[in-house]
Every structure is written in C-alpha cells, then in structure tokens.
C-alpha cells in the first residue's frame, strides 16, 4: 500500500455522509408520491362505485318506461295497419263507384267538325287528321308508378329522346331557365350527387314554362320574342319556337307560333303557354288563346321547319287542367284540384276521329296526391315521365286498340 492510500480512504469517507443524506431524502419523496397516488386511486375507485350505483338505479328506472314505450309502439303500429287497410278498402270502393258512374268524356267525334280554307302559316283548322303511321292504340289504364328521386324545384321537366339511340336523361329545372342537365343514363341520375356527374347544355335564350321537348337530337322550346317582355296573366304577344341542336349547341331554326293572345292552356299550371308533345305521329303543341279562353287547342307541327300543319279547337276545358300528352294522335288532358288530389285523365280528343266517346277510358293515376308540372310520353317505352312538385316519377301505361270497348 502506497503513501497515497490513506488519503484516498479519507476522501471517500468524507463524501459518504452527504450521499447517504441524499438517498434518505429521495426515499422520503418517493414514499410521499406513492401515498398520493394511492389516495387518488382510492378516490377513483369510490367515484367508479358511486357511478356504477347511479347507473344501476337509472337502468332500473328506465326499464319499466321502455317496456311501456314498446307496448305503445306496437299499439300504434297495429292502429296504423288497421287504418291503412281501411283506406285501401275505401279507395277500392271509390274506384268501383267511379267505374260504375264514370265522368262524362270530353271526346269530340270528328263528324262534328267541319273543314275550312287553310291559312298560310297557320295550317288547316279543324280538319280530320290523316295518320301517317298504323298506330291505333289508346290508354286503357295507368298501371303503376315509380318515384325516382327529388331533384330541383316544384316545376320542371325530365325526359328521354324518343328517337335517340342512347339512354340519356334530360332534366330542365324551372320555368325560366337556360341550362339543361344531361345524364348518361338513368342510373347516373338516381345517384345522391347526380348533379356533379351531369353535363350542362346552355341555350342562348331562357325557355318559358315547362313545355319543352327533346326530340330527334334537338331541344324544342318556346321563348318570348326580343323586345316583347310580355307578362301578367295573359301574353299580349305570341311566342317564338326555337329548335336547338343539342350536339352542336346551336340554334338551327325558329318560328313565331301562329297564335296571338296566348294564355296558359292549363288552369293549374300558370307558367306554361305552349306545351310541346311527341308521339308516334310526330310533333304536337297544346295551347290556348283569349279567343276561346275556356278550351284547349291542339296543333300538329313539322319538326323540320316548325311550320304548323293543322290546328284543332278541342272540347277539353282549361279549368282544373294541369298537364297533357299525345298518344297515337289523341290528346289526353290530366285534371286535378287545389289542394292537390288524385290526378285523372278526364278529357280526350282524337284528331283522326277513330276514338269515339263511348270507347274512351278516363283512368285515374296511381294513388298519389300531387300536382304534375309536366308529363312527357315516350312511344318506345310506353311510359310517362312526370315532374311532381320536384319529384321525378315514371308511370307505366297499359294500352288497347281504339276500336275495343272499355
């Protein structure tokens, strides 16, 4: 052992005392922290026990209430089923009574109309229409309906092109607008975010009402002539028909409709002044004028030139009419009430004279209380595309020969 060893031992002994003191304080600190944690843990256990007891008490109180609510729900469901059955039975009885006591048809037999000299630009008036196809069907009944979705405002139009080779859906929202939505197929239209996937076609002039028509790749619509704002309940001016090419997005033709003092043809659809329609025979227009403000007029149009080929004064009243469509040369007018009830075809006019009054069926639409802003007939599908307060609906039609008895 060298001479420096005692000095090293003395040095280590001098440091051992303070280190032992520090260890003692550290142990005391750890004991205090553990005691605090144990106290908090005990508090948490007490709170958990108290909360568990409160939850048990709440559950015991709620179980009887839930049993009572379940019994009341079952009672309400039973009552609703009973009421639904009674309503169905009443509707069947009403339908039976209506078939036993049908409303008087408004079909005009063409032996009563007489021909007159033609007027240039207006076409022949009240002459029997010569069918260009062998279409001889009439509506037997409106069999079913399917509500597709709700899109847009209370008034609008949706349709397919009856002559088109695609399944495109055209949607024209509103009564004074200039943009149409085009969907590739019906499935795309029914999607939740359908508007994002639709292409938009903007026309150079805003349309008037819900009388537009897509036919043969063209959009036909009515507009107010420039410089003639019109307005009010009656239009002092006539309307201009526009033929718009949907693919090229250009106006290819236009023509002033040969009728002055136009008024809405439908008493329940005040924004439409000319309602364009298409069937197996071609292009038609439904309108009314102040000259006879009680009844509808029908015109046959040339889809190429927009010329009016023939015109008829129909016996179908404007009052309570809401929409119309044409099938095989026969005009069918749909009537309703305000507030809305079940719509019904209550007037027909066969321009060819084939459908006689006693053979005209006047069916109700399926059980739905609404108001049709527009109806478009598709000859290929034998379906109606309807706009009902923002809902897009498809009606399937059952047909029969015009010569068959009802």
Swiss-Prot record:
Disulfide bonds join 135-328. InterPro entries: Olfac-like_dom, Olfactomedin-like_domain. Keywords: Coiled coil, Developmental protein, Disulfide bond, Glycoprotein, Secreted, Signal. The keyword Glycoprotein applies. One of its GO terms (cellular component) is extracellular vesicle. Pfam families: OLF (PF02191). Belongs to the OLFML3 family. This is Olfactomedin-like protein 3. The lineage of its organism: Eukaryota, Metazoa, Chordata, Craniata, Vertebrata.
